[in-house]
């Protein structure tokens, strides 16, 4: 079985002192880049999709594509619902075969966040589906959800333990100073907060908003307990900019099989670097 849950992946990463990258994909080409690169580097990876991606590509289509590529490359893959907010939407996709879910209602008050997350956990665990949730809130925009910098807040380590125990989640996404999107300047990550969270929470920890972080910062977060690194914007930017450049230089180009190659190559460079930064090459 090549389509797997993230639970074992992240537990292996936790024991091994590395992180598993979760790459947000959008179509056939972006998925090809992630899977082909991961297979060539023998690295465990997570294929992540926001609600918008699943709407764009179709849940059944994405599931079939992940399954086919996992078998083709003899490489274990996990497909993950990223930043999903609605129970019915999650339930439908779980019934379609998705094995990993992020329920994100971190904008709600603490008690409501617990209640909504626990409802999803209770349902998903019946199907052996792993669940990630977020405590604290990142600034920036992910899909159609935008959080102003003033409304972002960091994860409280003591609350994090209560949250993890009350919900039964399998992994916890933390807010320590990252944001969705690219950074105008390098963020100042709160490493001491992350270290405290690890001491209070006995779960794999997840870092969102990793696009544009330095290798040094990524590797320091892994040392302090991060087991899953989410990358989205950096992939889109590399793909899109290379495509724009190619079409500007070759205005006569009309064959997608040709002009998409430069976009895939640029994105492949990002995927390779993230895998190396996460220390997961050769771990699949």
UniProtKB/Swiss-Prot annotation:
<dbReference type="GO" id="GO:0005829">
    <property type="term" value="C:cytosol"/>
</dbReference>
<dbReference type="GO" id="GO:0019404">
    <property type="term" value="P:galactitol catabolic process"/>
</dbReference>
<feature type="active site" description="Proton donor">
    <location>
        <position position="82"/>
    </location>
</feature>
<keyword id="KW-0298">Galactitol metabolism</keyword>
<comment type="similarity">
    <text>Belongs to the class II fructose-bisphosphate aldolase family. TagBP aldolase GatY subfamily.</text>
</comment>
<dbReference type="InterPro" id="IPR013785">
    <property type="entry name" value="Aldolase_TIM"/>
</dbReference>
<dbReference type="InterPro" id="IPR050246">
    <property type="entry name" value="Class_II_FBP_aldolase"/>
</dbReference>
<dbReference type="InterPro" id="IPR011288">
    <property type="entry name" value="TagBP_ald_KbaY/GatY"/>
</dbReference>
<keyword id="KW-0862">Zinc</keyword>
<keyword id="KW-0479">Metal-binding</keyword>
<comment type="pathway">
    <text>Carbohydrate metabolism; D-tagatose 6-phosphate degradation; D-glyceraldehyde 3-phosphate and glycerone phosphate from D-tagatose 6-phosphate: step 2/2.</text>
</comment>
<feature type="binding site">
    <location>
        <position position="83"/>
    </location>
    <ligand>
        <name>Zn(2+)</name>
    </ligand>
</feature>
<feature type="binding site">
    <location>
        <position position="208"/>
    </location>
    <ligand>
        <name>Zn(2+)</name>
    </ligand>
</feature>
<dbReference type="InterPro" id="IPR023955">
    <property type="entry name" value="TagBP_aldolase_GatY"/>
</dbReference>
<dbReference type="InterPro" id="IPR000771">
    <property type="entry name" value="FBA_II"/>
</dbReference>
<keyword id="KW-0456">Lyase</keyword>
<protein>
    <recommendedName>
        <fullName>D-tagatose-1,6-bisphosphate aldolase subunit GatY</fullName>
        <ecNumber>4.1.2.40</ecNumber>
    </recommendedName>
</protein>
<feature type="binding site">
    <location>
        <begin position="209"/>
        <end position="211"/>
    </location>
    <ligand>
        <name>dihydroxyacetone phosphate</name>
    </ligand>
</feature>
<feature type="binding site">
    <location>
        <position position="180"/>
    </location>
    <ligand>
        <name>Zn(2+)</name>
    </ligand>
</feature>
<feature type="binding site">
    <location>
        <begin position="230"/>
        <end position="233"/>
    </location>
    <ligand>
        <name>dihydroxyacetone phosphate</name>
    </ligand>
</feature>
<dbReference type="GO" id="GO:0009025">
    <property type="term" value="F:tagatose-bisphosphate aldolase activity"/>
</dbReference>
<comment type="function">
    <text>Catalytic subunit of the tagatose-1,6-bisphosphate aldolase GatYZ, which catalyzes the reversible aldol condensation of dihydroxyacetone phosphate (DHAP or glycerone-phosphate) with glyceraldehyde 3-phosphate (G3P) to produce tagatose 1,6-bisphosphate (TBP). Requires GatZ subunit for full activity and stability. Is involved in the catabolism of galactitol.</text>
</comment>
<feature type="binding site">
    <location>
        <position position="181"/>
    </location>
    <ligand>
        <name>dihydroxyacetone phosphate</name>
    </ligand>
</feature>
<dbReference type="GO" id="GO:0008270">
    <property type="term" value="F:zinc ion binding"/>
</dbReference>
<comment type="subunit">
    <text>Forms a complex with GatZ.</text>
</comment>
<dbReference type="Pfam" id="PF01116">
    <property type="entry name" value="F_bP_aldolase"/>
</dbReference>
<dbReference type="GO" id="GO:2001059">
    <property type="term" value="P:D-tagatose 6-phosphate catabolic process"/>
</dbReference>
């Amino acid at each position: 079985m090549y389509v797997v849950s993230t639970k074992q992946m992240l537990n292996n990463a936790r024991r091994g002192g590395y992180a598993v990258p979760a790459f947000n994909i959008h179509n056939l080409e972006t998925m090809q880049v992630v899977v082909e690169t991961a297979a060539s580097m023998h690295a465990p990876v997570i294929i992540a999709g926001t609600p918008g991606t699943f709407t764009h590509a179709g849940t059944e289509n994405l599931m079939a594509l992940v399954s086919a590529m996992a078998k083709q490359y003899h490489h274990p893959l996990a497909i993950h619902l990223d930043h999903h907010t609605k129970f019915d939407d999650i339930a439908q996709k779980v019934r379609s075969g998705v094995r990993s879910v992020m329920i994100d209602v971190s904008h709600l008050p603490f008690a409501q966040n617990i209640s909504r997350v626990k409802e999803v956990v209770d349902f998903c665990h019946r199907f052996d589906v792993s669940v990630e949730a977020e405590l604290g809130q990142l600034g920036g925009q992910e899909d159609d959800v935008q959080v102003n910098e003033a409304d972002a807040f960091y994860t409280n380590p003591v609350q994090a333990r209560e949250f993890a125990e009350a919900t039964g989640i399998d992994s916890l996404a933390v807010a320590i100073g990252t944001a969705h999107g690219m950074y105008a300047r390098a963020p100042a990550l709160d490493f001491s907060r992350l270290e405290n969270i690890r001491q209070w929470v006995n779960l794999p920890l997840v870092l969102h908003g990793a696009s544009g972080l330095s290798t040094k910062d990524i590797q320091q977060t892994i040392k302090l307990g991060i087991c899953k690194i989410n990358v989205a914007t950096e992939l889109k930017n590399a793909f899109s900019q290379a495509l724009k450049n190619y079409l500007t230089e070759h205005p006569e180009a009309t064959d997608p099989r040709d002009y998409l190659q430069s976009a895939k190559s640029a994105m492949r460079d990002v995927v390779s670097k993230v895998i190396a930064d996460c220390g997961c090459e050769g771990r699949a």
